[in-house]
Amino acid sequence: MYCGHFGFSEKPFDMTPDPKYLYLNRNNKEVFAALKYGIRDRRGFISIIGEVGTGKTTLLNAALDQLDENTKAAYIFNTSVTFDKILATTLFELGLKKSDESLSKIHAIDRLNNFAIEQLTAGGNVALIIDEAQNLDMKSLENLRLLSNLETRKHKLIQIVIAGQPELDAILQRQELRQLTQRINLNR
């Protein structure tokens, strides 16, 4: 009813985060710029923390839409799974694994590492973007830290973005994750 009244061609307040409706207030503009910069300039680990409904998912989707053509990205939104499943989904999204193919964790990481080196050599980049990261278990967070070890002497091979609600910030402050927290180069 309101669409006709206001002359809208579609509902602007849908329940799914459509990046074309992204509103960049001052804070979101800063976070969006930092996110794009962090991926482009190979900052390694990036975290985005915000309350429910503040636009984190929409920002992530908009950033994915605006990545340059040389950046390959995997977007993970189901975080109530094991790290092995996150790794398998990452490989699948990057076109490195068939959906029914089974790989050990070592072989999966090796395949991802080789792909990231190929991308770097060709002038490309690789990003792993994880939404709802507050649902990740401690083991998955520690494995993400280990994944961030994929690097050359000069470059991080995989740019890892974790986005989540304020609970994620509390989780990252835990003593057992101090090594991960030290690797976060951009924290918004």
Give the location of each predicted region.
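A short, basic N-terminal segment
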Residues: 1-42
